[in-house]
Amino acid sequence: MERIDKIIASQGKYSRSEVKTLISKKRVTVNGEVIKSSSIKADPNTACIVVNGEELSFKKFVYLMLNKPKGYVSATEDKNDKTVLDLVPLEYRHRNLFPAGRLDTTGLMIITDDGEFAHNILSPKKHISKTYNVTIDIDMSNDMVLGFKEGVNLSDGECKSASLEITGKNTGIVILTEGRYHQIKRMFGCFGAKVVELERIKMGNFSLPSDLKMGEVREFSSLELEEVVK
């Protein structure tokens, strides 16, 4: 059981002070009964809560996918730059959202308020793969493919085995199961190459939807979320 104002505010559409105002105006009902106090408690999973004429669909956590564009940093706040949270629709802004991991380039990013889920998809022990399209400034080579497979030795230690599939003269697909700082750029740097373009296109078995435009955000379905952790 939780306080009714906390339940409603947790869903992001209304702040806690706004909820209290709505309650004072008799705009909130629980199981058909008008609520007169914000301290009333209810079970968010079973109670029928109606706010301003709209039934509340309770979600303990939200999971958002973002097709991250350039020019936004993977942080909750930044004094100098725009953050990925600036792209989140207003209806989610009251939730304690954060980006699940860093993405310094473009592509698929997960934004959530579920800390345990974020930890699980980022933990190297879980072996959840991340797939990237990459373009470099020189020709791809079989030496790179072999080096990625054997494990590139970086300044902070040897990388786990990674996959590099050559798709063009200077393009390829990289699959990692760990996420070090600027890892792909540093790995190609060991072969004298500079990464020109880098886009994350897949996490686990979930691919970036082709209809999700750059900068757009939408919620995961439960089935899509399962694909991430497979």
Tell where the protein language model's regions lie, with residue ranges.
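Basic, flexible Lys/Arg- and Gly-enriched helix-loop patches that mediate nucleic-acid binding at interfaces
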Residues: E2-K230
